[in-house]
Structures are given as structure tokens and as C-alpha cells.
Amino acid sequence: MEKSDQSKIAIVTGGASGIGLAIAEKFVKNNITTIVIGRNEEKLKSAKTKLGALCETIAFDLNDLSAIPELIKKLVEKYSRIDILVNNAGINLKKEFTEVTDEDFEKIIHTNVQSIFTISREVVKNMIVNKSGSIVNISSMASQYGLPKVIAYSASKGAIEAMTRAMAVELSPKGIRVNCIAPGFIATDMSAKALNNEPERKNKVLSRTPMGELGAPSTIGDAAMFLAGSEAAYITGVVLPVDGGNSIG
């Protein structure tokens, strides 16, 4: 049986802005102590101000794989346990297929896949001791649709979904659930600004979205809260589209 959501400890990577911040905000509103990991200290400071006393922010580059075990060790020592891990941190690169270098591809895979594997492995060690835990990975509709100029990003998000299913099967007997959210077009400050500067592209995006609008970041926060919390106690290995109907086909 899962403990009350209100007594849980959560980590949200890439949680200082956009979707990650919306997830952290939802957790804090549900009285979950939330550790936000990010690289931009100014954004982390702003997130701390917004989220308040139930939030701890940590400036950390997840590409530093060798430092992740020590980071998680210190957090476990401080909080005794980690109940929830949201793997949201990731980067994108928009380039023509033939312009993507090996270094470009490796950087995307390293950040979006390898770092998720490493931090998940370290957090799971503690979850196994506690015989409970929930991991929510963030992928993208790009993993399921052929979108142009994002070959490395699409490949990385497909890998995340495959890892989600493999982890769910292996970790379920240990009391750990692993699920994934595949966002569609979400109106973060960055994406909304980009689309507003490209009216033709924005119209194309909206026309292919059955609900006819961009999703609010809070919709991903709601989905993450559901999958991470006790209401989803019998759900694991799921990739949940939150995309305004894009996945209908």
C-alpha cells in the first residue's frame, strides 16, 4: 500500500521552468516535498520563490554522470527516502538530418537518455529498500510521429518510452511503478513565443490538434501528479499521451 501522497519526497529534474516547473508546482500544492534539479541558477532562484518552503532547488548538471550517485546519496541522507522521481530534463536540437553531426546526436542521447538511466538507477536503489516508489518519465509525441528536423530528439524520446516499459516490468515486483507522459504541443513560455513568431506554423500545429489549442503546462503537472500518486497505484508501464488528441491519428 502506498503512503499518503502528502508525506512523500519527490525529485523533479529540469524543474526550474516550463513543464518541469508546472509539475513541481502541482506536487507542492499537494504538500509533497519537492527537490527541483536544474542548471540555470537564476531560474532555480525564481522557482524557489514561487514554490516556497516545500521546495529545495539544486544547481546540478545531469551530464556529470559520475557525480549523480553522490548527489542522490546526500539527498537520501537528508530526507531518508525518495518516493517520486520525475525525469523531465532534456534538450532539443532542430537541424536538417544531413546537418546533424555525430557530436550533436551523442549530446542529445547523453542528456536525454543516459542521464535518465543513471539518476533512475541511483534513486531506485533507495526505492527498493523502501519497497515502494514511482518514476514518471517525460517523452514527447515526437517519439511516435515523424516530425522533421528533430531526428536525435525523436530517437531519444523513443528510447525513454522503451526504458519505461522495461523498467516497469523489472521493478514492479519490488513495489516500484514506472510510467511515462508523452506531451503534445504545450504552451510553455519558450514554445508559445516561438509559435507566435511563426503564424503559419502555429496554424498548422493547431489544425492537426483535434482540440484546436495548445496545452497548458499545468495539464502535464496534473498528469504527473496522477501517475506519481496513490490514485494510479495499479498503473505501470503506461505511456500517457497528453496531446489534445494528436495521438488519435
Model segments located where?
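Conserved glycine-rich cofactor-binding loop
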Residues: 16-17
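Substrate-binding pocket helix/loop in short-chain dehydrogenase/reductase
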Residues: 96-97, 101-109, 205
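C-terminal helical subdomain
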Residues: 180, 203-231, 235, 244
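Alpha-helical segment proximal to the catalytic Tyr-Lys
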Residues: 125, 169-173, 233
